[in-house]
Amino acid sequence: FGRFFAGSLFDIYGGVFARPHLFDPDSPPRKKRDLRVSAPEVHWFETEDGAQIRLTRYQGGTKGPVMLVPGLAVSSQIFAVDTIDTNLLEYLFANGYDIWLLDYRYSIELPTATSQAPVDNVASYDFPAAVNKIRTVSGADSIQVVAHCYGAITFHMAMLAGLQGVRSAVSSQAGAHFKVVGSNRVKSGLYLDTLLDRIGVDSLTAYTDEDADWLDRFYNTAVRLNPTIDREEMCNSSVCHRITLLYALLYEHDQLNTATHDTLHEQFGVASMNNFQHMGVLAREGKLVSAEGEDIYLEHVERLAIPIAYIHGAENEAWLPESTELTFNWLRENNDRHLYSRQVIANYGHIDCIFGKDAAEDVYPFILNHLEKSA
């Protein structure tokens, strides 16, 4: 008991020297709570360039349809986590929406997660195919979109490339302009993504578990020494440390409950190097450009002349709040200024705006309020 008690204290207060917490893949599956939604309706379909992608429908009513689009190295399950009392899927379902969860080609639930296809292909092919699928199946003339992070970035690319059939959108944490924290600015400035690609690294993952080999375990130890993490955000989760190293701190720890933090390995996984390279280009350019760095998007600002609400965590360290402020001001200067709104969420970071323990009270009402105006 003494050794266990001392070990527990050390795990809590030992900082980088505490034992890392790793998921045991051989443990029995955890019991998940039943979600307060209907049975899912799954639709697989092919994009024009041959990618197999997926939409999962939950028909909570006749409002919408609304398509929920996740970020990078995750899946649409970020909207349906069972570890919080009410997730965004359940929230919109209870409010009468016809909800469609999109898993585009980089979703960690699809075999194409490590595809090296240009990110522009998501905008050019995945979004049009998904919007057309929803309109065809539902019979709706147009849809609404709630897009998070990389999903929001590629949504802006898609709209600026001429996407049709979207009547309003909520953009979480990202837009068409980018400001990054110093550590990410250094990484992009050193072209670390390009360097890794040249030495044969074709993907990076936040996932790790107890079966990790010696190299993975060494990496797990190394990432705990990340000097950019504030002491108040220190923890013993190797997955959490990997997430922070790859992307920046994506949440305020006090906005996640223990169950969500303990199951981050279920939500985060692999991403291909072409995605990291494109994010590096965006960070360096400060605006939407193609994978080759071509300025092909912002010249069509009129294509974003739909109602868009921007939501940004005040503590976001992936894309700083100034990012969506730049996009918000740019749109208001060039289109009808009344089409756009922006809400900065105090005490929230990045993805905690999606699955934070109190997101249903602190964040979701802003999403719902915007959707209701064009439901």
Question: For the regions a protein language model found, what residue spans apply to each?
Answer:
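Alpha/beta-hydrolase-fold enzymes
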Residues: 1-14, 136-141, 150-290
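Catalytic active-site module of serine/aspartate enzymes centered on a nucleophile-bearing elbow/loop
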Residues: 334-375
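Conserved alpha/beta-hydrolase "acid-adjacent" motif
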Residues: 317-323
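Alpha/beta-hydrolase active-site loop
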Residues: 117-137
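Short beta-strand/loop motif that positions the catalytic acidic residue
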Residues: 304, 310-312, 316
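Conserved alpha/beta-hydrolase "nucleophile elbow" surrounding the catalytic nucleophile
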Residues: 70-72, 143-152, 313
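N-terminal cap/lid segment of alpha/beta-hydrolase-fold proteins
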Residues: 27-59
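Short, surface-exposed "cap/lid" segments of acyl-processing enzymes
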Residues: 47, 54-109
